[in-house]
Amino acid sequence: MKRIVVVAAMLALSAGAVVADQNQVKQTQAQMKETGKNAGAIAAMIKGEKPYDQAAVDAALVKFEDTAKKLPTLFPDSSKGLKPDGDYSPAPKVWEDKAGFEQHIASYAKAVADTKGKVKDLDTLKAEMPPLFKQCGGCHETYRLKKG
C-alpha cells in the first residue's frame, strides 16, 4: 500500500511539473506574440502603411523593454524539448549555446535602451529602429525554428 501511495505521489508531481512547463511555454509565446505585434505596427509606420503614431511607438518600446527584461527567464532548462503549439518553437541551440543566447539577449536589451527616448518622429523612427529589428532577426535566425 505504501508503495502505491509513493508511486501515485511521484506521478502527481511529474504531472504538475509538465503542466508548469507548458504554462511557461504559453507565457513565452504570449510575450513573443505581443512583441511581434508591436514590431509589426512600427514596421507598418516605417513602410508608410500606417500614419506615424508617437503613442504607439512609445507603447511598443515599453513592450520591447519588458520583453528584454523577461527574456532571460522565458526559456528555462525545464522547457527544453517541449513542442509548443504555433508556427515556431525554440531551437535546441537556445540551451546548447546558452552563452550565445544570453549574449543575443544582452544585445537586444542594449538596442532597446539605445532606441528608447530617441524616436520623436517618422524620420527618427526610420533611423533608430533598423538596428533594433536587426537584433530581433539575428536571434530568430539562430534560436528559433519554423514548424512544418
Locations of regions flagged by a protein language model:
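Sec/Tat signal peptide C-region and signal peptidase I cleavage site
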Residues: 16-20
